[in-house]
A protein has these predicted regions:
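Auxiliary, metal-adjacent structural segments of Zn-dependent hydrolase domains
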Residues: 91-152
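Positively charged n-region of N-terminal signal peptides that target proteins for export
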Residues: 6-14
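Short pre-active-site segment immediately N-terminal to the catalytic Zn-binding motif
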Residues: 158-177
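Active-site recognition of the HExxH zinc-binding catalytic motif
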Residues: 171-191
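Metalloprotease/metallohydrolase-associated module, dominated by Zn2+-dependent proteases
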Residues: 203-278, 284, 296-304, 309
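C-terminal motif of bacterial Sec signal peptides marking the signal peptidase cleavage site
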Residues: 26-30
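Acidic/polar, low-complexity intrinsically disordered N-terminal segments immediately downstream
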Residues: 32-112, 261-309
């Protein structure tokens, strides 16, 4: 009868609903009882070496600087073919940078009692070492170091250095580091705009590459690169005064001619006054400290990097 057919249809619907509820409940129960398996990725922090612990104490905690010696593609310019820095060379360079750059400023400020946290505050936050050199394809010039917006300094050709050759260290690294650090400082506190007018007619964004050192001196530049533009000129004066050996500055002035020597001396005097007025940096005292420390590098190279220093 029609009524019986209707009853059968309703019973089928009830059974289907009941079956669906049963199966769903079973699936939920099964899922709740399953345990997540171990990750296929290694989630354990990498083991720290004795060198890593030394960097943690002497760079991260002391100066808030991340000293990277392992090659990381996220940090490096991958348009170049890079080779990782050798660990032993990295250890020596880490000691030298701390002793010859960071601690030189510390020693100067300790004498005056001001700006004791200067390097912790203003030094670049990342120092990255690359074992190989980098060649600029557009100019075929070798890049020894570079900086990115005052945050990171990249030092190349680490595997080729002789840690005891101070002249090589200055050419490869410390001239670059003082150069880039001076950029950081003048970007925070501007130097006098009058400086830009001293050699205004002789700056050339590309022509500087064709000038010899002597030609640059006679135009009033301490290096050919200083003739690129005023800001580079300003920081080159500071960097070269700090790292060049005794006698270099006097020889440069003697060979620059009357006009060139006068321009270089005027630039130096302005840079010296600005460093003292803006940052309490006595550039002559700082240079004295750097030169003295340069003569004692051997004394720190063989120091052990122990965890109980």
């Amino acid at each position: 009868t029609p009524d019986n057919n209707e009853i059968r249809k309703n019973m089928k619907k009830i059974l289907l609903y009941a079956l669906a509820i049963f199966l769903t409940g079973g699936m939920i129960s099964s899922c709740s009882e399953d345990k997540l398996g171990d990750s296929i990725f290694d989630t354990n922090p990498p083991a720290r070496t004795e060198f890593d612990n030394w960097l943690l104490r002497n760079y991260v905690k002391e100066y808030n600087i991340d000293f990277k010696y392992r090659l990381e593609d996220i940090e490096a310019n991958m348009s170049y073919n890079h080779i990782p820095a050798e660990v032993e060379k990295s250890k020596k360079l880490a000691k030298i940078i701390k002793y010859l750059w960071l601690e030189s400023y510390d020693e100067m400020f300790d004498k005056t009692g001001v700006n004791k946290d200067f390097m912790r505050t203003y030094a670049p936050k990342v120092i990255l070492l690359i074992g190989s050199s980098a060649i600029n394809p557009s100019s075929s010039t070798e890049i020894l170091g570079s900086a990115e917006e005052g945050i990171k300094v990249v030092l190349y050709k680490v595997n080729s250095i002789d840690p005891t050759d101070v002249e090589m260290l200055n050419e490869y690294y410390f001239e670059t580091m003082h150069h880039e650090f001076a950029h950081i400082l003048h970007q925070k506190k501007s130097y006098p705009t009058e400086y830009n007018q001293i050699s205004a007619a002789d700056y050339s964004s590309t022509g500087w590459q064709n000038r010899t050192e002597l030609q640059a001196w006679k135009l009033g530049f301490v290096t050919p690169y200083a003739g690129m533009q005023p800001q580079e000129d300003f920081v080159e004066v500071i960097a070269n005064y700090l790292v060049k050996p005794d006698g270099f500055w006097e020889n440069m002035l003697a060979n620059a001619g009357t006009e060139g020597a006068a321009k270089i001396q005027t630039k130096f005097d302005m840079a010296k006054e600005w460093l003292m007025a803006s940052w309490s940096i006595d550039i002559e005292e700082l240079r004295t400290i750097i030169i003295r420390r340069s003569e004692n590098i051997d004394s720190i190279l063989n120091e052990k990097m122990t965890d109980n220093e």
